[in-house]
Amino acid sequence: FLSFVSSLGYTLKGNIKNIKPTTIQKILNELKDKKEYKILSNLLLRCMQKAVYKPENIGHYGLASPCYTHFTSPIRRYPDTTVHRLLRTYLFNHDMKPSTLHKWQEKLIYIADWSSARERSADDCEREVEDMKMAEYMESHIGEEYEGMISSVMSFGLFVELPNMVEGLVPIREMDDYFVYDEEQMTLTGEKSKIRYKLGDKVLIKVIRASKETRNIDFEIIKKL
């Protein structure tokens, strides 16, 4: 991530060899006024390890807190309920017998793994529904042109995000040149045209396909802005 940000010409301060939560916050603060901020903040988020539930207290990296647990949320999650049960066992039932502790130690491993798996499943479901509804919406806009920003660069094409948050793919097989993919710099460069596409570039696109059934939206690039 830091290498890519540097390739855009931005110089970041701080000790990048010893990344702390405060370092990440400083990086985001330095980038907040840049036109690519939304793209870069999402990229930084994807670079970070996915959080999982564990029986042991390992603190909270983002909050820079050595002590952290789930307690409540807008929707009552199972980890929240588990913490409530533990507190009730200790505070109200005053049950700290070795047998009780041993029972919970065994249960918490299973509960943590199960909760992590269900959260991943819920996230996948949410993404699929979002993709389906975006494709359904764009089915009635095929042939229309929009300005957008390149949100991701892959070996198979470019993802472009429109101002209305709809994201579609520009398949590399349908681009009018042979494009070379640079994974480190996250760019596609035309072999003949020398046109170079990177994260944050603004482009004018046309909607060429959209399917609710496949949850796919395809664009074609008209020109780089």
Language model feature labels by segment:
Residues 1-163, 169, 176, 180, ...:
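Append "with occasional cross-activation on large, charged helical scaffolds in nucleic-acid assemblies
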Residues 185-191:
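Low-complexity, polar-biased intrinsically disordered regions enriched in Pro/Ser/Thr/Gly
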Residues 192-194, 198:
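C-terminal structured domains
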Residues 223-225:
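Short peripheral tails and domain-boundary helices/loops at the edges of structured domains
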